């Protein structure tokens, strides 16, 4: 038990052994701590606290062997609430060089969070039941940036679904309300032969979680995320994502809608990564729903658009040049409108319904792209059957080509099919502490 303890305006400094057994120095600036009426009985697992106040400034914690530093501007804790300001995950290395320097060639990340506010923290239940219960969590002004550099080969490994981290967390969590305000994601990807990364970004996102917990209390229990935002800063979208609480329930659900989007905005992504330029195209409405597991998914999509035209490019003398024959061929195959205009065969809507098998060697974010890609391509004129046939033909020709050329990587080993090609990955990898 502790009757009263007070610490005011303390500067706390400490050292520890960090990367390569080097001595690291840390400090807590302007630290204040006041505790009154603390009583803990470990045998009876009871906890009593009359009052607690804690504040400190300018924290810094190294992560990932020193390749990142987690910086916190300030922490203010009262008896049942806390505010954490100016959170930043930064790397001392430039983003274009990061993956070369990181031992496992991981992706570069940069994360900033304006503020995290926690209200009605139930400290007694944490000490007595080992459950962290919080009535309200507010997160604001979040920016997540990520660069994937395909020029650097990485070892393949099976990537678990994103929600398994919460399911297996060492602490039981039960948050009644979680809201995220003004969240932006900027994803960049540099192709094997590219010089400029392609960019995909989501801005002005707001989200609300209900049932945010990893405590299983009933069958078929889900965390529900309702979100809205803008694709490429232009297309307004809404989405509902249901994530399983129970690790034995290998099933998630996702429904989304996108309204009024200019497809030429995707050229920031497509030009650097796929040498494809959307010349014109306007989305009137896109809706999709998917039921998925860690093994595969089924998806239904309605993609309504007008005047879709594209150009296939190749680099010549350092400049992108129209591959006129292939461009003409592609635009003959493409359905320029959905529904087709009257002269193209009537106004019948084209719906797409397909099933896919997940490639488990990529992240959950990439898996969503795996789910969306087949129905999108089917909607603009190429059925899933034709896509699979084309893939088989390309694989066959790749095998023949590799057989006669003896295609090898830098280590002298044969490259498996699909490994030596530029492919659009669209994925986030987690940062390991």
Language-model features: locations:
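Outer-membrane beta-barrel and related beta-rich outer-membrane complex signature
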Residues: 147-152, 313-317
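Hydrophobic residues positioned within well-ordered beta-strands of beta-sheet architectures
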Residues: 52, 114, 225-227, 239, ...
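Extended serine/threonine-enriched, polar tracts that run as long, contiguous segments within proteins
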Residues: 229-236, 246-248, 259, 263-265, ...
């Amino acid at each position: 038990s502790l009757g009263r303890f007070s610490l005011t305006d303390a500067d706390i400094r400490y050292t520890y052994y960090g990367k390569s057994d080097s001595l690291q120095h840390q400090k807590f600036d302007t630290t204040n701590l006041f505790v009154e009426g603390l009583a803990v009985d470990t045998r009876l697992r009871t906890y009593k606290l009359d009052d607690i106040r804690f504040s400190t400034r300018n924290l810094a914690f190294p992560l990932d062997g020193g390749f990142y530093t987690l910086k916190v501007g300030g922490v203010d804790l009262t008896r049942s609430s806390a505010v954490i300001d100016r959170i930043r995950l930064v790397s001392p290395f430039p983003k274009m060089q990061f993956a070369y320097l990181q031992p496992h060639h991981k992706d570069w990340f940069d994360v900033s969070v304006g503020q995290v506010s926690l209200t009605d923290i139930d400290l007694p239940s944490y000490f007595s039941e080992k459950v962290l219960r919080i009535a309200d969590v507010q997160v604001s002004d979040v920016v997540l940036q990520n660069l994937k550099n395909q020029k650097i080969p990485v070892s393949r490994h099976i990537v678990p679904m994103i929600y398994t981290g919460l399911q297996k967390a060492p602490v039981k969590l039960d948050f009644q309300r979680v809201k995220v305000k003004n969240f932006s994601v900027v994803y960049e990807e540099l192709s094997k032969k590219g010089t400029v990364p392609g960019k995909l970004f989501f801005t002005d996102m707001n989200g609300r979680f209900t049932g945010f917990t990893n405590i299983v209390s009933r069958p078929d229990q889900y965390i529900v995320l309702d979100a809205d935002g803008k694709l490429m800063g232009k297309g307004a979208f809404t989405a509902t994502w249901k994530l399983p609480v129970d690790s034995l329930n290998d099933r998630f659900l996702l429904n989304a809608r996108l309204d009024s989007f200019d497809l030429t905005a995707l050229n920031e992504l497509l030009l650097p990564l796929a040498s494809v330029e959307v010349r014109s195209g306007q989305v009137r409405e896109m809706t999709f729903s998917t039921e998925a597991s860690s093994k595969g998914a089924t998806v239904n999509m309605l993609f309504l658009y007008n005047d879709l035209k594209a150009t296939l490019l190749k680099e010549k003398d350092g400049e992108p040049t129209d591959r006129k024959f292939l461009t003409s061929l592609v635009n003959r195959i493409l359905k320029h409108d959905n529904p087709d205009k009257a002269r193209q065969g009537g106004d019948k809507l084209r719906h797409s319904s397909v099933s896919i098998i997940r490639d488990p060697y990529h992240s959950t974010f990439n898996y969503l792209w795996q789910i969306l890609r087949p129905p999108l391509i089917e909607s603009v004129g190429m059925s899933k059957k034709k896509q699979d046939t084309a893939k088989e033909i390309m694989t066959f020709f790749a095998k023949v080509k590799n057989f006669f050329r003896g295609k090898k990587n830098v280590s002298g080993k044969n490259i498996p099919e699909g490994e030596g090609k530029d492919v659009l990955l669209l994925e986030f990898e987690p940062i390991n502490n």
